[in-house]
Swiss-Prot record:
Keywords: 2Fe-2S, 4Fe-4S, Biotin biosynthesis, Iron, Iron-sulfur, Metal-binding, S-adenosyl-L-methionine, Transferase. Its EC number is 2.8.1.6. The lineage of its organism: Bacteria, Bacillati, Cyanobacteriota, Cyanophyceae, Synechococcales. One of its GO terms (molecular function) is biotin synthase activity. This is Biotin synthase. GO terms for biological process: biotin biosynthetic process. It comes from Prochlorococcus marinus (strain MIT 9515). Belongs to the radical SAM superfamily. Biotin synthase family. Binds 1 [4Fe-4S] cluster. The cluster is coordinated with 3 cysteines and an exchangeable S-adenosyl-L-methionine. Binds 1 [2Fe-2S] cluster. The cluster is coordinated with 3 cysteines and 1 arginine. It catalyses: (4R,5S)-dethiobiotin + (sulfur carrier)-SH + 2 reduced [2Fe-2S]-[ferredoxin] + 2 S-adenosyl-L-methionine = (sulfur carrier)-H + biotin + 2 5'-deoxyadenosine + 2 L-methionine + 2 oxidized [2Fe-2S]-[ferredoxin].
Length: 335
């Protein structure tokens, strides 16, 4: 049983071991939820950030991520789309802001950013979103040091680059990019002064040990990622994981709660697969530390609750919308 006075939960750490994370992940659920709530209340207010996600360029990705319908290796029937023009993207951002979102995330189905007109347009989009008074986030694969610096100069708030799963299970999910490639990308983002958005997916066929290992990598980043998206697999026909069954909502609750304990100040984002959770399960996730959601009826190529449904949910829960920009009080190890 967790002792709420336990010193190992009293400060922010960067030296978590896989075995102790696995122990936390497997605690009796009521104890795990209790400890996560204590830590969440200690380090955060009960506010939820509303982030809107838009697919700027859809389909045709050269990576072979087995969960993704945008991969050229997938036979799913998604409608590919070339990169939208700057004006169209900014109009979408304006709509998201009008609906209440304060963070606009833009996704490109790329293996990596390439210099040229598409990248220059990306920079314009970032500047335009910031001029609207919103946080700007980009997810577009790997990038160079110079590209990261140019994005920082454009005012990019955060760059998303997920680890997906544990280092050990990773080879079962993707082989066209290494785990180290992902870590190097995150390092470049951090070195450029851009906030890091980095999380993973559960329900890929991994076990609890893999989940603990993923959380070990994330929680030992120094500083912690400012945002940690926790996704559950949305099995899409035509992808390599189309036969995977939905995870139980308790597994998502455990993952959210454990992430909150390990990374007390990070925004823990309840992400893909949220539509499959009951209203009650989502409320428990908020109680256990989730303080950000993707807001709007679509996440890249998967569905999501509507603006109206989410506004009603948050009103029923009684949490406030978080309008504090992600400048984030970064706690860094002094060791």
């Amino acid at each position: 049983m967790i002792n709420s006075d336990n010193q190992k939960f009293s400060k922010i750490r960067f030296d978590w071991a896989r075995d102790e994370i696995l122990e936390i992940l497997n605690y009796p659920l009521v104890d795990l939820m209790w400890e996560a709530q204590i830590i969440h209340r200690r380090f955060n207010e009960y506010k939820v950030q509303l982030a809107s996600l838009f697919s700027v360029k859809t389909g045709g990705c050269e990576e072979n991520c087995s969960y993704c319908s945008q991969s050229i290796y997938s036979s799913s029937q998604i409608k590919s789309h070339p990169q939208f023009e700057v004006e169209a993207v900014l109009n979408r951002a304006k709509t998201a802001k009008k609906e209440g979102a304060d963070r606009f995330c833009m996704g490109w189905a790329w293996r990596e950013i390439r210099d040229g007109k598409p990248f220059n347009s990306m920079l314009e989009m970032v500047k335009g979103v910031k001029e609207l008074g919103m946080e700007a986030c980009v997810t577009a694969g790997m990038l160079t040091d110079e590209q990261a610096l140019r994005l920082a100069d454009a005012g990019l708030t955060a760059y998303n680059h997920n680890l997906d799963t544990s280092p050990e299970y990773y080879k079962n999910i993707i082989t066209t990019r290494t785990y180290q490639d992902r870590l190097e990308t995150i390092k470049r983002v951090r070195n450029a002064g851009i906030n890091v958005c980095c999380g993973g997916i559960i329900g890929l066929g991994e076990n609890n040990g893999d989940r603990a290992s993923l959380l070990e990598v994330l929680s030992n980043m120094n500083p912690h990622p400012e945002s940690v998206p926790i996704n559950s697999l949305v099995a899409i026909e035509g992808t390599g994981l189309e036969e995977k069954k939905e995870i139980d909502s308790i597994e998502m609750i455990r993952m959210i709660a454990t992430a909150r304990i390990l990374m007390p100040k990070s925004k823990i984002r309840l992400s893909a697969g949220r539509e499959k959770l009951t209203k009650e399960a989502q409320i428990i996730c908020f109680q256990c530390g989730a303080n950000s959601i993707f807001y709007g009826d679509e996440l890249l190529t998967t569905s999501n609750p509507s603006f109206q449904d989410d506004r009603k949910l948050l009103k029923d829960v009684g949490v406030l919308f978080n309008k504090d920009f992600e400048y984030c009080d970064k706690t860094v190890s002094t060791v």
